[in-house]
Structure formats: C-alpha cells, structure tokens
Amino acid sequence: MARYTGATCKLCRREGMKLFLKGDRCYTDKCAFVRRSYAPGQHGASRKKLSNYGTQLREKQKAKRIYGVLEGQFRNTYERAEKMRGIAGENLLKLLEMRLDNVVYRLGYGASRTEARQLVNHGHFLVNGKKVDIASFKVSVNDVITVCEKSRGSERFKMFAENPKALPKWLEANVENFEGKVVAEPAREDIDVPVNETLIVELYSK
C-alpha cells in the first residue's frame, strides 16, 4: 500500500504549525519546527498570502498529514461522510478518528499515529478477538481492541502500560488487561485536532 516516505518534519513546516507527527520528539528542542518554523524550500521563509482555494487546500493537506492518510483514501472517506446523516465535515473527522490506527494511538499504544499504524500493520492487535492488521479498519461502538498475548511481554508495550494516556470520552481502557473499548462515537468536541473541517467541505464542494 502506498504511503508517504519523505521527511516528516517538513510536513509541519509546510503547514506552519506542529502536527505532532513524531511523538515525544515534537515536545523537545530537537523538533525541526522549533528551529525553522518557515516552509521548506528556497522561498519558504517568505510566505505569500493564500487565496481562498489555497487556504482550503492547506486545511485538507493538514488533516491528511495529521491522520497519515493519502489522497485516495481521504477522498473516499469524505464521500462516505457526505452520505451519512449529519454534518459532512464532522462526519469526516469522526470516520478518521475511528480508524484502527488512530484508536490504537488514542489508547496510548504509540507515541504518534505513525508508530500506532506500524504496530497495527505488524499484527500486534485484536479487534473482538480477531487479529486485524489493516490500519484503516473502521472500528464500531462496543468493539474491544486488545494487544495480542505474545506482544504483551515486549518492553514497548510494558512501557505503554506503565504510562497510561488520558483518554477521550468515547474510549475506555483496562490497562492491566492491555485492552481498550469504543464506548461511543466521538463528538466534535472530543476531537482535538487543529482542523477547520468546514474549509475541507468547501473545497470538495467546488
């Protein structure tokens, strides 16, 4: 499956803000955005004022980069969001939040969504007792996500268990059992990503 293989820190510089794509490193002085907060490239330091289209496009790119989704997947997710009841932009964020890789990240099994995606792809998780290694798998309310028995002894998972993460309202966790549960669909106020989804809807509505 296609994925972005370029320099991760350049993505934050391109969007003009920290997207926290590299986990703990983003909170330190080693973060590239701290040292060079302007866009990459020869003319990056002199940002031009964006047109309405440019602003909408940047918002879409930002959302794609935060969730680690490429254009085709993102477009398909938006088309699904449009067909759902409710507000298309909020539906889009809800669908992105309920990807398995994002849920694993929200449960604290990964310092970043990138790391969580790798853990899913390597087969470390069960959903309702069945192994799922597809990062884009959509979880549902009442689904139970569990770390595979053979993975629990690794130092990485022990570290996650010893340093539990604050959870959003729509998730519950049983740290001792290496288990998390989706107890509700995320509401917009539960989604703490710096994205204006209305701009994305406007872009796709053209």
UniProtKB/Swiss-Prot annotation:
UniProtKB keywords: Ribonucleoprotein, Ribosomal protein, RNA-binding, rRNA-binding
GO biological process, one term: translation
The protein, known as: Small ribosomal subunit protein uS4A
UniProt lineage: Bacteria, Bacillati, Bacillota, Clostridia, Eubacteriales
Cross-referenced SUPFAM superfamilies: Alpha-L RNA-binding motif
A GO molecular-function annotation: structural constituent of ribosome
Alphabetical list of InterPro entries matching this protein: Ribosomal_uS4, Ribosomal_uS4_bac-type, Ribosomal_uS4_CS, Ribosomal_uS4_N, S4_RNA-bd, S4_RNA-bd_sf
Any GO CC annotation of this UniProt entry: small ribosomal subunit
